[in-house]
Amino acid sequence: MNHFSDTQWVVERAKSIGFDRCGVVRAGRFPELAQTSEWLARGYAGEMEYLADPRRSDVQNVLPGIASVIVCLLNYNTAHPLSTESTLQNDQVEPRGWISRYAWGRDYHDVLRERLDRLADCLREHFSEPFKARSYVDTGPVQERVLAKHAGLGWLGKNTLLLNETLGSFFFLGVILTTLDLAPSLSAKELPPPDLCGNCRQCLDACPTQAFVEPYVMDARKCISYLTIELRQSIPEELREPMGRHVFGCDICQDVCPWNRRAPLAALQEFQPRVRPSQNEEKAGISLCPGDESLFLPKLEWLAGLSETDFREMFSGSPIRRTKWRGLVRNACNALGNSALRPGTRVQVRVSALLERLAASAEPVIAESARWALSRIQ
C-alpha cells in the first residue's frame, strides 16, 4: 500500500465525519519525546505519575507492529467571551467563577472517541488487508501534540500547546494508532510547520501563577489547570490568590495568544455551555447562570454548596467529573476567598455562612480551603 492517495482518502473521510483537520505520521521516535524524561526528572509533573509511563517514549510500545498514526483535530471554540474579556465584577450580588472553555459542554473524550470509532470502521471497510487500529483521546500513553506536529498539523507553542495557523489552539486531539502502512502527510523532504511564535511572549507573561519556567517548558505544579483538576491535596497557599476565580482549568495562556484572535468558531452543539443540567437547581430555588448557561461564569455559591450526589448527577458526561466533588468544592471555596466581598453586605453575610458550614466539613481539603476563604472576606 503506502500510496499518498490512501492518505488523502483517510483525511477526506475524517473531515466528512466532522474533524476539522487530519494528518498522518509514520510511527517512530521523535526528538521531543526524549525531552519528557528530563521534564519528569525535574518534578514538573507533580502528582501526575501516569506521565512517567515508559510507553509514552515510543508508540511501538503501545501497539506492536504499528506503522502509522492518524491524528485528528476537532475545534471547540465558542462565541462566548474569553476569560480575559469576561467581567467578574458583579461580586456584590452573586460571585462567579471561571470554568475552562473546553469543559462547558459534553465530555470531549466521548465526542472524539465516537468519531474516531467511525473513522476506524471506515478504514476496515475500505482496506481489504487485515490490520490493527487503536484509538486514544487524551487517555493513553500517547503524546498527541508531538504526533500532531509531525503530521503537519501545527507547531508546539511557548505555552506548550499545539498551535495551528488557522485554528489557533482551541481544539481537541485524537489519534488512531494502526498497523496500516500509510504514506505520511509530510514527505521525507518536508519539515513540520515552522514555529510562528516569534518574539511573542504574551502567554508567558500573562500566567498569574508563573507556571512557565522558560518558553516551551511548564512546571505543571504551578499551572492553574493542574491545581484545579489534578491536584488532590490542598492548593499551596502562595498560589491561591493568583488563581483568582478559576474553579476548573484555565484558558489565560490561550486567550492572550494572537493566533486565537481570529480562530473560527465550532459548529458542534456538544461543546456549547450546558443548559440546566439537572432539576436540582429548581429544587434549590436558584438560577445557575446568566442566560441559563450553567457553566459559563457559574455562580460560586452554587458550586461550593453542591452535595456529592448533586455533583455526580449534574456533571454526568462532563469532563468536570475528573476533579471530583471535593476538588470542585475546594476550588469554589478558594474562588470565593478571592471575590473581594465587602464586609457587612448581604452577599458577604450569605457567603460567610456557607463557608462556615464548609469549614466544618469532614473532607480536610474542603474544610481547610473554606477556612482560608473566610479569613479573606471577613
Predicted features and spans:
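Amphipathic alpha-helical scaffolding segments comprising HEAT/armadillo-like alpha-solenoid repeats
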Residues: 310-314, 345-359, 378
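Auxiliary alpha/beta "docking" domains used to position bulky ligands
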Residues: 1-196
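Alpha-helical adaptor scaffolds
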Residues: 290-326, 333
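Short coil turns that connect the paired helices of HEAT/ARM alpha-solenoid repeats
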Residues: 319-323, 357-366
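Conserved hydrophobic register position within alpha-solenoid helical repeats
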Residues: 332, 370-371
